[in-house]
């Protein structure tokens, strides 16, 4: 799922 991948990137970017 792309959503899962995007969530991971978003989390990393947020941190």
Curated annotation (Swiss-Prot):
A single Gene Ontology CC term: extracellular region
Free-text remark on how the cofactor is bound: Binds 1 Ca(2+) ion.
Protein's cellular compartments: Secreted
Main localisation: secreted
Biological process according to GO: lipid catabolic process
Mod. after translation: Contains 7 disulfide bonds.
Lineage: superkingdom: Eukaryota
EC number per UniProt: 3.1.1.4
The keyword Mitochondrion belongs to this UniProt entry's keyword annotation: no
Expression sites (tissue/organ): Expressed by the venom gland.
Record keywords: Calcium, Disulfide bond, Hydrolase, Lipid degradation, Lipid metabolism, Metal-binding, Secreted
GO MF terms held by the record: metal ion binding; phospholipase A2 activity
Catalytic activity entry: a 1,2-diacyl-sn-glycero-3-phosphocholine + H2O = a 1-acyl-sn-glycero-3-phosphocholine + a fatty acid + H(+)
CC cofactor: Ca(2+)
Protein function: PLA2 catalyzes the calcium-dependent hydrolysis of the 2-acyl groups in 3-sn-phosphoglycerides.
Protein name according to UniProt: Phospholipase A2
Organism listed in the record: Bothrops jararaca
């Amino acid at each position: 799922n792309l959503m899962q991948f995007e969530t991971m990137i978003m989390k990393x970017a947020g941190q």
